[in-house]
Amino acid sequence: MTESYLALESSIDPLTFLTLMTRITQYILPLLFGLLLLSCSKDKQSQQTTQDEQQTPRVATPFEADSAYNFVAKQVAFGPRIPGSSGHTACLAWMKERLTQYGATVVEQSFEATAHDGTKLPLTNLIASYNPSASQRILLMAHWDTRPWADKDPNAANHTEPILGADDGGSGVGVLLEVARLLGSVAPPQTIGVDIVLFDGEDYGSYSNEESWCLGSTHWSKNPHVADYQAMGGILLDMVGGRDASFYWEYFSKSYAPQLLTKVWSKAVELGYGSYFHQADGGGLTDDHVPVIRNLGIPCIDIVNYDPRSEEGFAPYWHTLQDNMSNISAETLGAVGHTVMAVLKELDAH
């Protein structure tokens, strides 16, 4: 999924930027998180060329990429996960069952939202918490709904057909379910808490209205599952399963969570995933991390397959009927999942 949201390209409205900056500066938490990251990081790595990054030897991973792949395939087997559909209902029940089985404290946040076209949408955010009593917390996010229309499909006859959303919707959830499995078994957090939030209603937007996207994250960030919720930082996974995916520094991520962004990308390169994680600027995207930054002041980053060098930015199958399992790579899922687990391990050790 992740979003088909309208890609804002790199042009950001100055007023929007100023509003966001004003809100964010009201919070001191991002500064504290920056100090934490600096204290547990080694010497800064200098930026490497793509060739150097590709030659970095890969480190053995505890993250089971095949398991994450199977989690994606299971979601796709439910069919399109459009709010109110049978596939949506069945997938929600399955995700809740998995997360409960993996030892999380699970909360369902059900609500009704009005879409840009006036449609009343029954939505549910799913929150899974590990070590809920810990005061220092990390937020991991993805969206689990799929786009109702394949409106970027090269065949106009398909524009009203729903997509399967293997990558855009399924991939981020697949990685986080595998993270949850590990947190509930071999890698339980000791000193920090981890909250996995799966957002609904991200992909029901209109390209001409950026506020019409990210309905689930907007609702949760205004009505968090815990009163006065805060986290040291947040990591959003969106479209993280494509073959030969390219993850660049997303604009809002770099603006509001530069320490976390550097931490994650440097760790990815250290682990041998520099061919995926490019240490260079990408575009600005309206994605689920933006409402969380705006409404809660939590510094968040977006790991999203968006290549500013390409014409569309997103993968060719984005919002088309081709967003299916044929475009999902276990290797890409493993690169992202291994990186996230390694960052969690470092933060938990300090």
Enumerate the predicted regions with their spans.
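Catalytic-core environment of secreted peptidases
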Residues: 65-71, 76-78, 102, 124-185, ...
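Acidic/histidine-rich catalytic neighborhood of metal-dependent amide-processing enzymes
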Residues: 160-259, 288
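Second-shell loop/turn segments in exported
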Residues: 56-62, 77-86, 113-116, 158-170, ...
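C-terminal motif of bacterial Sec signal peptides marking the signal peptidase cleavage site
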Residues: 36-39
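Bacterial signal peptide processing site
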Residues: 41-43
